[in-house]
Regions:
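Conserved beta-strand termini and adjacent loop/short-helix elements that scaffold enzyme active sites
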Residues: 6-8, 73, 104, 160-162
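A generic secondary-structure signal
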Residues: 30-34, 62, 76, 150
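Conserved core of the sugar-phosphate nucleotidyltransferase
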Residues: 53-126
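Conserved N-terminal catalytic core of the sugar/cofactor nucleotidyltransferase
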Residues: 1-51, 56-58
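Left-handed beta-helix
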Residues: 126, 134-221
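Short aromatic/basic micro-patch
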Residues: 21-22, 53, 121-122, 142, ...
Length: 221
């Protein structure tokens, strides 16, 4: 168990020899050796540009109860309430009453409430190994196109709805916006003050900022 941070571009043994990956699926092919030997029954795959405080235990229980091959963690958003429009690379997920995914497509400027892929997912390790081997054999490179869309209705793909605070950073403007959001105590509590889910940050014992008599500071943490 636990978190394993794998160095990027470990692609030895992938098709074509040493190469730099450009997609999620190519990156997974590059860490095939780790997947083979990690010993876990299920693996959580996540991007690193999301802001949220999530307990994966409930999502994992849901994944196991559904006997899912892949469980995609989704978030319900209302496009009419967003400060920034959704990126075209965001995936929209539709699922039935049992949580089974029935449609998966790129965002196409739809308005209203949408279930979007948070780019966090739980995958059965044996299934992931089969995906990696098939991708190597057939030259697949897109997780969305070659795995999810190709196998919808054939394999067990489920959604798990995350209902906590969520945002993602895909630009400098969004980075600034998300930081400014943390000045709002109600938003800050949703990230840093969730019961039994503390956020541990790195201690930086550096010299404090010096404020002179003519400094003007407002709305600062």
């Amino acid at each position: 168990g636990g978190i394993r941070i794998l160095p990027p571009f470990i692609t030895s043994g992938t098709r074509g020899g040493e190469k730099l990956y450009t997609t999620r699926l190519e990156a997974l092919v590059g860490v095939k050796n780790f997947v083979e030997n990690c010993g876990a029954d299920h693996i959580i795959i996540s991007d690193c540009n999301m802001i949220c405080n999530i307990d994966f235990n409930d999502a994992l229980d849901n994944h196991i109860a559904n006997d899912a091959d892949i469980t995609i963690i989704t978030k319900l958003v209302n496009t009419n309430e967003l400060k920034f429009p959704l990126d075209k690379y965001i995936k929209v997920v539709n699922y039935n009453g049992n949580g089974e995914i029935v449609d998966y497509a790129s965002y196409d400027r739809q308005n209203g409430e949408l279930h979007i892929n948070t780019n966090m997912m739980i995958v059965k390790r044996s299934y992931l190994l089969d995906l990696i081997n098939e991708s190597e054999a057939r030259g697949y490179d897109s997780f969305s196109r070659d795995v999810i869309r190709r196998n919808l209705g054939k394999h067990r793909f489920f959604a798990y709805e995350y209902d906590g605070y969520f945002n993602y950073i895909d630009s400098m403007q969004k980075y600034f916006f998300c930081n400014m959001k943390m000045l709002d105590s109600s938003k800050r509590k949703l990230v840093f003050h969730v019961k039994n889910r503390p956020v541990y940050t790195k201690v930086r014992n550096s010299a404090p900022t010096r404020y002179t008599s003519d400094a003007k500071v407002t709305n600062s943490i």
